[in-house]
Structures are given as structure tokens and as C-alpha cells.
Amino acid sequence: MFEKIGKNTSMLRTDERVCGTIYLIEEGGKRLIIDSGDGDAEIGFAPDICILTHGHFDHTSGVEENWPCVLLHPAEAAFKGPCLKIPKNAAPNPMKPLIFGSHLLEFFHTPGHTLGSICILDRKTGILFSGDTAFAGGGYGRTDLGGNEKEMEESLGLISKINYKLLCPGHGDIEKREE
């Protein structure tokens, strides 16, 4: 069951140890999800757009073949590494701002956890969907499953400069940014 975290934004969590959080933005009868989980969660619909923050199985295994638009950073689709599961219907994310209803989504390439990790900023709500790059409490994603420690440090530096209000990571708690 999705839990509201904003006017048009909800999240679905299952077993966070093995399944990434699924985020949903709904507007005008359209649905966009960020990450699809590990396939155990029943979302009950085919989203109009699915954006994957990276290619690890706990964020991609929920993608179904009939989903019309699945986007993944181009570097991720080309990389073959541990724990990656790239859906067959994933297309390269052009990494250009995406307008979804009244939401403007901006993409940031944040390698470190994986080569093609991204964060997504919803300019309307101030929500930063950080995948497994940054977590509440200052935590960050592991770099031993196809990542790179130096790139992670650079990505965390980039995130610290992004003007967001709410951090929504791929696992664990969401966190309001202190002003």
C-alpha cells in the first residue's frame, strides 16, 4: 500500500533489507514511478513512466515487459557488474529535464554506488530521490558492487549543493533537510 509523502507523491516500502523503496508521482490520471523494487511488491498498475535510479536487482526486478517507458542511465545499461539486472525494455535516459504534469524532474548523474547511478530532483516539491547514493543521517551507498569510492565522494559533494527539501532514498527513512 502506497503511503503519501506529499500532495501527489507516495512511497511503497516492503522489506527494506532486500527491496528498494518505490516512489510514485500521480497527476492527471498519469503515473510515474521511481524504481520498481525487487518484484515482490504488487503495485497493481503499469506506470506511464518508470525511472530507475540504478540497475541493481532490488530496484529493477519489479519492471514488467508491458511497461511502456522505462528509463535507465546509459552507462548503467552498458555495464555488466555484480547484482545488476537490466530490464529488457529499459531505454537510455536522455538525462534532460522531464515535465510530468506540473512536475519538473531534473536528473543528476551521481556515480559511485554504480557507474550509472542517478538522483532525481522534483523542482515542484523539492523532493530529491537519491536511490542508493545518499541516505538519511548522512549515510551513503556501498561502492563494492560495481561502484567507486572516489566517484561516490564527488557525487555526495554534488548532492550537498542541490537545493532540496526532502531526501527520499532507495532504502530507509526519508529525511527533511535542515535549513
Residue spans for each PLM region:
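Internal catalytic-core helix/loop-beta-alpha segment
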Residues: P87-L121
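Active-site environment of divalent metal-dependent phosphoester hydrolases
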Residues: C19, D40-A41, G55-G62, A77-K80, ...
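Short glycine/proline-enriched coil/turn segments at helix->beta-strand junctions
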Residues: G28-K30, I43-I49, E64-C69, R123-G126, ...
